Amino acid sequence: MVDEDIVGVEFVGVNTDRQALQFCKAPTAIQIGEKLTKGLGAGAKPEVGEKAAEENLDDLKEAIKGADMVFVTCGMGGGTGTGAAPIIAGLAKEMGILTVGVVTKPFSFEGRTRMNNAQSGIERLKESVDTLIVIPNDKLLQLVDRRTTMPEALKKADEVLQQAVQGITDLINIPGLINLDFADVQTVMKDKGIAHIGIGNATGDDKAIDAMKIAVSSPLLETTIEGATNVLINIAGDVSLPEVHEAASYVQELAGEDANIIFGATYDENATDEVTITVILSLIHISEPTRLAL
């Protein structure tokens, strides 16, 4: 994610593992729990990750001081991320910072213990953030072919995490055809609970509407757009204003007149004949067969 050089975002890496932090590309790296773990990992124990974060509360507060918005991202199920993420998010929210969690759930083949840890961590993190976007790794298997290797699958998970963050921050930080400010984003993300993300890419004459259809039907959403009360949309690429209007109207028709839809659009001359659309849904009315995966 650091390599993508996302505009307006400062990265902070947090880990108990001293050796792992040496490979961290974030300009700021914080080792937590040195007294507790002696510079080693958390041993896949979330309680160790939690105590490690509590050991370095002042360092964590200093790292996020002055931020308007904090994203807490990690892969749930292990020790450090699962245990420390709710602590870090709680600090940010207590400081009055708009706090968004973007996390992955492990593949089911990683075992019951790791999945149970992830479920518990997600529940705790949900109480500590304004909005929580959960990306189930199992659903990524529907987006790749059978020949995809494990490293490639994990890279895909990282790409979705990156797109979730960038899809939000670019709306604020990059001037475009339709601009949003921080207050707009805050409206649809402050105290909203669980959210879902869909991403669509398309080319051709109908690229905008095609990308939107792919995004709103993405398996990552684990739900349908009908009944969503808040919808945040980022349309980026080689796109015209009429194409933006067509795609936005399609979403409005699906979500209904009562949905609060906020969207921004940026033109990228380097994205020749390609459009990428990120859709984030929150406060979804649950009805059969819609379900939330937690």
Per-segment meaning from a language model:
Residues M1-S287, R291:
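Tubulin/FtsZ superfamily GTPase core signature
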Residues L294:
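Nucleotide/phosphate-binding catalytic cleft detector across ATP-hydrolyzing
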